[in-house]
């Protein structure tokens, strides 16, 4: 917290012509958050800056060593090289200023080139990594001898290196060991994505260095119902009765989005305290009791058993096995948005997920039938909306896959039959989302109204291009913040799906069953531009979500 503020304080002290922050007479949001966390007994890490410096720094220190970096396809940026003496000096002063301003919980997060490629300044990337570890160790030893460095394993991409990868140069397990062994300051490796990547297994529990099991679960746009709960419990139990024997000294949860899937996150929180004591059946029962009240346990347990069988089961999506609603992406002829190496596993999963549809419908019906629960409990209403939107999404996915298959088979009649089904499902989804305030695009716009000159465009750019600033576009990050919001579905996803069907229809009529990437881009790019340029067009929001779900169930008898 307060990274930019502290950086400017340090540079102003160094005599650079930067505006030092003006002390606030009232507690800032950062102050209030830290105070609240400390009242709960939570230690808050200090996130050290990467070393990126303003133009004034390079004018003052023209001979300072630098690294030119690039993240995805965005403009390259420059940061101070960790081997330059100014790097250590800056980090020491940063920690001093931070502790004077906010105090210290003696935990420090610092990463080197995470997700970024080095374009200039380091021919040997591993050598630069080791220089970073040594500089951080020396700086923290001087600035806070009682602290602990918390490096994240997210940087340790252990897949085969691909020079065309826009993110970073990958690692070998030997390089990870050399990196950690170079540290002369206490550390705890934060093994981000333990529940799936499990790098602690591939590195022999980080070669004796203390580490923490860290659940990632989702990126910023993965906001559908997902998370294999049995696998999470299995991995936590596999650490044994005494996880410290394999160096595991912590268990944390670090999602990019925590506003969804509370069932999964509550389970992860319970595993943090005593993994071996957690039993899934007992957890489901307790979750229902705490969420809805003891009088509704018998009525709601079957709802969550169905969800554990489906969206929270073995065919659940992950950050790597992407089972998202397919309308969140540009549809093509593959309809596979995850890692290509997983295609053979994912294709049969899509087929099996057709079995989710009647079970999700039944879950919604059971929740509606639970006395007056949905009427009196806002969390139950939220759960009803989430189950219903997942039911709609699964039906859409199967219909779109069927339409793709019909096109590849040259079956124009089946393609024509499925088109209105897909588009109607998106109308149903937009209507449902508009009935729940948290799922309205206008709500996001209202939250940032004072932050951007054109908040509508900023929010739309964020959802399309992962960046609220116009002109900052990166193809690998397109639709990163994909999610179910009413106008996003009605004014962006639906027109894109309509363009998909129009293109396939024309191709099919001409007797062709192939479409190039360039042809898809030609019909999708105008949809994206039109959505970003259009004003906000709020949908009717006067319906009760319970009524909407009941209508949709009645109108779609299976």
Language-model-detected regions and their locations in the chain:
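Catalytic-core regions of glycoside hydrolase
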Residues: 1-297, 301-308, 313, 336, ...
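Long, charge-rich alpha-helical interaction segments
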Residues: 316, 320-336
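Histidine-centered catalytic/metal-binding microenvironments
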Residues: 340-558
């Amino acid at each position: 917290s307060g990274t930019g503020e502290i950086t400017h304080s340090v540079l102003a002290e160094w005599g650079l012509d930067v505006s030092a922050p003006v002390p606030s007479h009232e507690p800032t949001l950062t102050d209030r958050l830290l105070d609240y966390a400390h009242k709960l007994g939570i230690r808050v890490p200090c996130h050290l800056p990467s070393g990126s410096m303003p133009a004034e720094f390079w004018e003052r220190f023209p001979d300072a060593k630098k690294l030119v970096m690039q993240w995805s396809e965005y403009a390259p940026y420059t940061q101070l090289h960790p081997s330059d003496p100014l790097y250590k000096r800056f980090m020491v002063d940063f920690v001093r200023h931070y502790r004077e301003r906010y105090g210290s919980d003696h935990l420090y997060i610092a990463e080197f080139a995470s997700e970024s490629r080095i374009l200039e300044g380091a021919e040997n990337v591993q050598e630069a990594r080791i220089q970073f570890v040594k500089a951080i160790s020396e700086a923290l030893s001087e600035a806070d001898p009682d602290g602990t460095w918390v490096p994240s394993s997210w940087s340790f991409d252990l897949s085969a290196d691909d020079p065309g990868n826009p993110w970073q140069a990958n690692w070998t397990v030997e390089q990870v060991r050399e990196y950690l062994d170079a540290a002369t300051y206490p550390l705890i490796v934060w093994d981000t994505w333990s529940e799936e990547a499990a790098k602690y297994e591939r590195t022999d529990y980080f070669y004796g260095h203390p580490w923490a099991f860290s659940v990632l679960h989702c990126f910023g746009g993965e906001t559908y119902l997902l998370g294999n709960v049995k696998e999470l419990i299995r991995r936590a139990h596999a650490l044994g009765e005494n996880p410290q024997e394999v160096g595991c000294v912590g268990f944390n949860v670090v999602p990019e989005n925590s506003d969804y899937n509370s069932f999964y996150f509550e389970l992860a929180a319970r595993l943090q305290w005593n993994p071996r004591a957690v039993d899934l059946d007992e957890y489901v029962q307790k979750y229902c009791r705490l969420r809805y009240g003891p009088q509704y346990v018998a009525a709601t347990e079957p709802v969550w058993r169905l969800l554990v069988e489906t969206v929270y089961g073995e065919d659940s999506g992950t950050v790597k096995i992407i089972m998202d609603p397919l309308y969140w992406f540009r549809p093509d002829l593959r309809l596979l948005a995850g890692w290509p190496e997983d295609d053979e596993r994912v294709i049969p999963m899509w087929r099996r997920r057709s079995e989710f549809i009647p079970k999700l419908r039944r879950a919604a019906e059971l929740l509606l039938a639970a006395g007056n629960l949905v009427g009196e409990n806002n969390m139950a209403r939220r759960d009803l909306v989430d189950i219903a939107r997942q039911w709609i999404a699964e039906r859409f996915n199967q219909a779109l896959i069927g339409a793709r298959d019909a096109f590849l088979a040259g079956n124009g009649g089946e393609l024509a039959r499925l088109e209105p089904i897909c588009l109607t499902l998106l109308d149903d989804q937009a209507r449902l989302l508009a009935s729940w305030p948290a799922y309205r695009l206008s709500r996001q716009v209202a939250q940032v109204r004072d932050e951007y000159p054109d908040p509508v465009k900023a929010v739309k750019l964020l959802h399309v291009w992962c960046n609220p600033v116009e002109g900052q576009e990166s193809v690998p990050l397109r639709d990163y913040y994909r999610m179910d919001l009413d106008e996003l579905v009605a004014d962006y996803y639906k027109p894109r799906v309509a363009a998909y069907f129009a293109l396939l229809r024309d191709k099919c009529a001409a007797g062709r069953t192939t479409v190039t990437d360039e042809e898809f881009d030609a019909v999708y790019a105008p949809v994206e531009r039109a959505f970003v340029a259009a004003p906000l067009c709020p949908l009717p929001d006067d319906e009760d979500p319970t009524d909407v779900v009941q209508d949709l169930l009645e109108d779609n008898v299976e």
